Amino acid sequence: MLGSSVKSVQPEVELSSGGGDEGADEPRGAGRKAAAADGRGMLPKRAKAPGGGGGMAKASAAELKVFKSGSVDSRVPGGPPASNLRKQKSLTNLSFLTDSEKKLQLYEPEWSDDMAKAPKGLGKVGSKGREAPLMSKTLSKSEHSLFQAKGSPAGGAKTPLAPLAPNLGKPSRIPRGPYAEVKPLSKAPEAAVSEDGKSDDELLSSKAKAQKSSGPVPSAKGQEERAFLKVDPELVVTVLGDLEQLLFSQMLDPESQRKRTVQNVLDLRQNLEETMSSLRGSQVTHSSLEMTCYDSDDANPRSVSSLSNRSSPLSWRYGQSSPRLQAGDAPSVGGSCRSEGTPAWYMHGERAHYSHTMPMRSPSKLSHISRLELVESLDSDEVDLKSGYMSDSDLMGKTMTEDDDITTGWDESSSISSGLSDASDNLSSEEFNASSSLNSLPSTPTASRRNSTIVLRTDSEKRSLAESGLSWFSESEEKAPKKLEYDSGSLKMEPGTSKWRRERPESCDDSSKGGELKKPISLGHPGSLKKGKTPPVAVTSPITHTAQSALKVAGKPEGKATDKGKLAVKNTGLQRSSSDAGRDRLSDAKKPPSGIARPSTSGSFGYKKPPPATGTATVMQTGGSATLSKIQKSSGIPVKPVNGRKTSLDVSNSAEPGFLAPGARSNIQYRSLPRPAKSSSMSVTGGRGGPRPVSSSIDPSLLSTKQGGLTPSRLKEPTKVASGRTTPAPVNQTDREKEKAKAKAVALDSDNISLKSIGSPESTPKNQASHPTATKLAELPPTPLRATAKSFVKPPSLANLDKVNSNSLDLPSSSDTTHASKVPDLHATSSASGGPLPSCFTPSPAPILNINSASFSQGLELMSGFSVPKETRMYPKLSGLHRSMESLQMPMSLPSAFPSSTPVPTPPAPPAAPTEEETEELTWSGSPRAGQLDSNQRDRNTLPKKGLRYQLQSQEETKERRHSHTIGGLPESDDQSELPSPPALPMSLSAKGQLTNIVSPTAATTPRITRSNSIPTHEAAFELYSGSQMGSTLSLAERPKGMIRSGSFRDPTDDVHGSVLSLASSASSTYSSAEERMQSEQIRKLRRELESSQEKVATLTSQLSANANLVAAFEQSLVNMTSRLRHLAETAEEKDTELLDLRETIDFLKKKNSEAQAVIQGALNASETTPKELRIKRQNSSDSISSLNSITSHSSIGSSKDADAKKKKKKSWVYELRSSFNKAFSIKKGPKSASSYSDIEEIATPDSSAPSSPKLQHGSTETASPSIKSSTSSSVGTDVTEGPAHPAPHTRLFHANEEEEPEKKEVSELRSELWEKEMKLTDIRLEALNSAHQLDQLRETMHNMQLEVDLLKAENDRLKVAPGPSSGSTPGQVPGSSALSSPRRSLGLALTHSFGPSLADTDLSPMDGISTCGPKEEVTLRVVVRMPPQHIIKGDLKQQEFFLGCSKVSGKVDWKMLDEAVFQVFKDYISKMDPASTLGLSTESIHGYSISHVKRVLDAEPPEMPPCRRGVNNISVSLKGLKEKCVDSLVFETLIPKPMMQHYISLLLKHRRLVLSGPSGTGKTYLTNRLAEYLVERSGREVTEGIVSTFNMHQQSCKDLQLYLSNLANQIDRETGIGDVPLVILLDDLSEAGSISELVNGALTCKYHKCPYIIGTTNQPVKMTPNHGLHLSFRMLTFSNNVEPANGFLVRYLRRKLVESDSDINANKEELLRVLDWVPKLWYHLHTFLEKHSTSDFLIGPCFFLSCPIGIEDFRTWFIDLWNNSIIPYLQEGAKDGIKVHGQKAAWEDPVEWVRDTLPWPSAQQDQSKLYHLPPPTVGPHSIASPPEDRTVKDSTPSSLDSDPLMAMLLKLQEAANYIESPDRETILDPNLQATL
């Protein structure tokens, strides 16, 4: 990414120089190219004048210019080219300009997005710019690919780009004007510019330098950055003053600095807010220009398009990258970087980025672009990637810094901040979606945005804004230094780190601040960087400082050596810095300077989510995200920062090889991360954004090997990080809090590194290789700078850190110590496992993030689906993870630093944690089970980390932290995650403690945020679970805290990370309302319940499967036993036959021989006694077998128990299974065993099995019996019991035998054998019985468990939908359903169902259960459709229930069967009532139904209780209505086809005034009443008496109406008594519809959208006068009997009546149907007659026949009466009127003839005579006068005669027009309607 970024940057530089083909690219590419050129491309291009590396720096520096709106041209000699580039950029990037952008356009020449480039092209870089084109082409390949068609119009395009940039900026949300004006482009570019043709830029840079405290460094950096820092002089002065104060205050001791910072922040914030409002336009413009593609959400359209383009490269690069980039947009950082396009590059990376960051909104877009750039840069150079990564940080820092002014202005209100927060949140969640997400960001619901951004921004942002403005800058710097130190430290090891850290702050921070910020100084950037300056650019500055410093330092050393590669490193470093800064910022945000931090956050917010993401989120992302997060943002933004920070990046990269790898690799990943970035965006806003991204980053690292895994990729870095971190912690250790802060920063850095390495395992090695060197180089020099910066920043940072660290940092530190030791190992492990892991991650950066997220937030899920499945979740989660990572990283690098700052107890836990983490990391990379604990913890947060970290801290510490957080507010959020986790997770967490600790806050926070987003639900559930595992208390505390702190969007984890934001949010969280929090808490609670219920379901399911296995095994054993029994039976038979043979032989011998006789006699005697003995003994053995139980249940109970016990032993049957069924078993056993089983045992089993197979088991019996023995207690019993029992009989027989002859001995032996075998057989039979019994019981328990699972599913469903049915009803139904199968079952269910609502409920006796619903019983259910009762219109009685039909269901019916039954009934009903299917209703129209008091919603899980209940025979079906955004319920009630109903509603909603005209009796009034009810329901207003006002124009005059409407209009205008204003006015029976339009328009003069709906009806055809018929205010709907809805209404109505009268009368349904079908024919015949012989308004409507009775006899009498008394008189009158008006139009036909011929009932002939004739109208006495009368009539009526057809034609035309637009409208309307509904 970085590589491509760099490339892009160069082309952009080219563009600015006037490169013709880069112009389009310029908006994004400009910044990028500027950055790249600064870093790489600018080196050559800008170096042109200045020379190689120096050149780029100089160019950069030169580019920084302060311009006045007036001095656009002077400012940028190449203004036009710049403009072109800019325009193109904007065009490419942004679709339109905001007002601010337009203002910027005024400065277009100077404002060209390529400010840096433009200046080059214009003056200093004119030539360079031209040369740049080649570079730009070369470098911006990726950029080109991202922003295609941008490159070509380099010069020319740039000018357009400038305007476009404004377009980009245009999004009003980009308060870029100030930022834009103070557009520190890129450090490198600045330097280059200063050398080349500093001209205006140079002047600006010098000014900035002069203004900035760090003049020298800024100067160099200014040259380097040379980004055109277009600063409004006034703004610059103000900002510089503030910044100087901030810087000065930073030099003070931490406390005074903090106080001063707070004051400065407040002042700056006020100033900025004032300037913001004035500059907002210009700022936006500038920002837009600079941000061009990425500027803000405003830039979204363009940004989206460009982003899309960029997304492409990223996408191809990271797979999911592209979408993520867009998601990245969400991360403000990304967005900021995006702006980076021109400004970032000009500012050179950090500053420019930050400028862009200012727009915060563009962040999301910027993020995308930046990411894209990063990705592209990555392509070019891993270093670049890192640079880009750093850029993110820088962006955060710088943009924040620079943008702080804007941001501050922007942060005019916390509401802006919250808005941004929301936007960020939205981005976060939406970013996952892709570039469209970006677009949607602005449109994303505020809640979502708020979720993410607010979460971050809430605490972090507000605090950040308040304190961070200054504090954050300090913090940022501190953290940045720390991070840089960290980065370098990790690369350089402890010494390097601490030194580096320090140096970097001085060198890097100062340098970067000085140079880079110096330019910003014009903007007050340096101050920003320092706390002093932070106020205006609080968010940006800190990040910028940190990121910039790190990047710069790195960039300086590496800038020359590494150039692009180093740039990447720098970016990485910066990013880390940013991360740290973000962290610090968080802390700072928590601090008083909240105003400033907030402003920046607000700025972001103002920009809406993308900016927040950029500003705060970016920082957090960058910092928190560490590599991943940053890279994410970097991906979008870092490219530019890369330019600015190339040198810096180098350091960073070298500092963190792993980081670099992530940079290169991560860039891609980061792209993926961009989605997380969205989350991150939110995170960023909160300052937790970083963490969130970090979470993503960390996740991968954790996944790799927890930290080790990640670290291995960046192993070198980790080592350095560990030591570096340690050192940084001390640096930050002014006090313990400082140390904590530092440790945190270090950890973050480390995490970042980890992240990075993991993020880009493959590139990590390369990057690491180069980075370590670069890092060291950069690290050493930057360390001093950093230290200095740190000193300034530190106090705030410390304060922030104190807060943050107190929670996350302290613990992280302690855990870090342990971790530190382990880090190397982990890293080593990582190297081992990191490779694969990285590969995993690398392949799909997004997936990696997902993995991270999944592993942390959902370890289990992670296991199951590393990448895509969780990706959605993961992105949000990733953000959380990033945050977590930030924390984690801190522990990693904190290990050594942490010991000093953190309590010893914490470290001990951490040691364990590292190990665990190590394992976990490995597991993460590969095994689904990263260790259950790990998984859980991670699940929680990667979340586990948070928990672990906190636990590591030690519960006490956690508590303390919590308390401190609570006090601090902001810290609390950080702590929150920690605290909640530690209690429950102490042990496992401690193992993971360090990382978790660090990560936890982020992860926790992120998860919350994530939860807010799409991921939230899952994550929340997981988090809840994790929390629960960690400790329910913890999770509960965590959640509420998160919610409270961050609003309702922050997850506990999120809260932790967003604690700063949260605090800030508390200060200015106008958006986090208690209600939202409550909702969030409720959601969390419900999610928790859902999770638990899901877990239960899973557990039960697994149990069920286990049971199924058991049952299968049992059945198998039963089969075996059966076969054994058969064998035994066969052997027994064999023995019997042998015995008989023996007897016969003995008898034979007796006869033959006396001895033989004696023997035979003995044998005979023996045989006679043996059977009895055998039987008795058998019983004895039986008894002995079942000894204990035999008394009560005979042997069956005992044997069953013994068998149970033995089987358990033998088969290892699940003890729980048995115990779970214990109660059921005992109860079932009692009755069953005693009765049925013993009987079976004695009778069935023995007999049946004995004879079965006598001969098969002689030998087998012996074998079988042992096995049986082992398997069952009875067989054992036989052994043991037989011992005593056999002996007696045995001995007796033996003695007797001895006394008798030898043959008798043989006989006795045979007898004893037979007896033993028979005993064995008996035992086996008993075993069989027992096993059968057990099998039965198992089946029963399985059934019960199935019921339990069903109940759980139902409960799950209930939880998903809402608080489900009362548990009271649930219990009752459980027994019922269980009773279905058998009393025993119901009993068992009641006993074993721990799930059962209550035993009392399930106390139904078995018999009750059976009687409730016998399995064979059939229940007839009556299905009705119930309409919601509405009493809106007086005297309007409407049917409440519509009978559909009956359905017979069995007593065993379940919900699925019942659903099908209801569907079938409804389908049959519709087919009967509407055979032509014109209504458009189907089973899809059913929303749900209720039986008894249980409601079943079809799209949800069925209720827990089974549907069968005694005495229930009614099912009430509800159809989809307003709540489901459907009109099916209304269609069903009115019988008007669905498309027409939707059309009517759409006309009403669109025009608010409708007149229905048509013959009387066509249902117009009925329809108006229904429409009025619908509108009332849709409005959501309380139904009052006057909500619908009805005027009957027959009874009331037009004057009354006019007076009423005038009063109404006055009432509405005064806005008094609005509640009494009717929503709908019904005008019934208008006599002259034409005049009503004028009357209403004249009287109702209030605003159109406040007017009530007006629906009129008229029986007269509307005369289409010019004033009325086509009048715009009223829409006409003509009802004709010839078309729907009137012509089909009668058929449908009568058929419905027939169905509803379902009774015995309908025995002759066919005849009745024939009669009812005749009625519409009759009506149509009469209608045709009246058309011929009457006037057009004298027609007969279907309502004449609605009173038709159902039943042939009733119908007969009704019809004869109707015909004679109603129809004939009406026809006569109509005919008379027709003759008067038209004369004789046609030959007269008596309608009665047709009626008599077609009478449908059987006895029709008798009734024909009863029907009256219709006599033809007689002219009578007037016949003579009739001709003249006719003539006069004809004379006077030609117009009416002619107009009638014309009218009809016009009406038809209008109707046709309405219908023509209706398909459109319906497709639009449907969504429209649904949306409005």
UniProtKB/Swiss-Prot annotation:
Annotated region (Disordered), positions in chain: 1-59, 114-225, 294-336, 386-839, 892-989, 1172-1204, 1244-1306, 1359-1383, 1810-1843
Modified residues (Phosphothreonine): 159, 534, 544, 572, 1006, 1170
Entry keywords, A to Z: Acetylation, Coiled coil, Cytoplasm, Cytoskeleton, Developmental protein, Differentiation, Methylation, Microtubule, Neurogenesis, Phosphoprotein
GO BP field: microtubule bundle formation; neuron migration
One family name in Pfam for this protein: Ubiquitin_6
Record GO terms (molecular function): ATP hydrolysis activity
Broad class of the protein's primary localization: cytoplasm
Xref: SUPFAM superfamilies: P-loop containing nucleoside triphosphate hydrolases (SSF52540)
Biased composition (Pro residues): 902-913
Location in the cell: Cytoplasm, Cytoskeleton
Cysteines joined through disulfide linkages: none
Biased amino acid composition, Low complexity: 32-41, 205-214, 301-315, 411-425, 433-448, 805-818, 1181-1200, 1265-1275
Expression sites by tissue: Broadly expressed at low levels. Expressed at high levels in heart, skeletal muscle and placenta.
Sequence positions bearing N-acetylmethionine: 1
Biased composition (Polar residues): 615-635, 645-655, 698-710, 724-733, 751-773, 1246-1264, 1366-1383
Function: May be involved in neuronal migration.
Membership in a protein family: Belongs to the Nav/unc-53 family.
Oligomeric form and interacting partners: Interacts with tubulin.
Protein name listed in UniProt: Neuron navigator 1
Species for this entry: Homo sapiens (Human)
